[in-house]
Amino acid sequence: MKIAAVMLSLAIGLSSSLAAAQTPPPAPSVTQDYEGAYYKRQLYVVTDMERALTLWRDLLGLQPGDITTSGPNSYSREVFNIPARAAMRFCTLSAGPNQARTLALLEVKGVRLPRKTGIRTTGAVINANGRLDAIIASARTMGLTVMGPRVLESATQGNGIEQGFLDWDGNVIVLYQFPNADAPSRR
């Protein structure tokens, strides 16, 4: 009898632990102040701005701002290790009004970019917003490298799909989609 009670107690404890692990943390109070850093955007270095825009603007639907020429003293040269002889252009893209300038493209011309082989160290994760199959089909048509899909489990949105691909410059893009899509985060 004691063994059965102990086993029942362990099973209840394990069940509670599993349920807790699958339960998202409570939403922070609206009045709680955030004192951390604010994420602004991700930047991809590309070799051809117009070609990159066929992916980001025409296929994924992001809205580009103006394309500007970066000068010789651009901070991008230092942080991205771009030689002075390279020409650079810059463009930010928005994902609707609530995600303004959430991605940047930096075109680098006049130097060869290194091939991205081995471990991929960064990637954009994007809600496909019900268009995952169409986007992946178009990525294949564009000749991009497409990885296989995977089931993506969520405690609150059901089972979804995630699928990644590489742009022409080897930059990683991972799409995901749930049956109960989440709204975009406000920026």
Predicted region positions:
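Core segments of cupin and vicinal oxygen chelate
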Residues: Y34, Y44-Q99, D182
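Bacterial N-terminal signal peptides
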Residues: A5-S15
